[in-house]
Amino acid sequence: MKPSLKLLLPLLALLCGQSLAAEKKPLQVFILAGQSNMEGHAKVETFDYIGDDPATVPLLKMMRSADGKPAVCEGAWISYFTGSGDKNGEGFGKLTAGYGSRSKPDEDGGKIGPEFTFGLTMDAALAEPVLIIKTAWGGKSLHTDFRPPGAGAYQLNDYQKKLYYGPPGHGIPKDMEQWLAEKKKDTGHYYRLMV
């Protein structure tokens, strides 16, 4: 069993057991996956600026509890699989601020991503409990790192072939065979972690 499933299954059992037994409502699951923008790099300290525009004042009110601290959803939970290098892991709990970019997967990063206001909005809009499954890594490519198996191996286009097999230059791999072997090894790595 994949490490991510080993972590996620107990969380799902806990959430389903508590919420569904009490409410007998289906669990609404949303998957948020992506790169650096999905990680989220907005610091909690920047919340005040949202109040500068009258159009976003209602959003700021939703983001904060009565004491001015970030809101904590009672009906929405999050499982966030992320990490740096080989140190991938899961952070989970009731949805609140701190599930943005994290250097340590299980520690509050003091940041938010789209999961925060998305989760607050879904919690307010839906009567059922909400689970957000988020997975995100910055600095990764869609054509290699997140490439799904059904897309096949990454193929150089004609321009790349002409450029890469031409004269040496900036950004051109020095050892094409090694570069292609690494590309093959890396293809789909983060897609598999995500799934």
Language-model regions, residue ranges each:
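Cell-envelope and extracellular/periplasmic
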Residues: 22-195
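Short, low-complexity interaction segments enriched in Ser/Thr/Pro/Gly
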Residues: 3, 21-22
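Positively charged n-region of N-terminal signal peptides that target proteins for export
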Residues: 1-7, 122
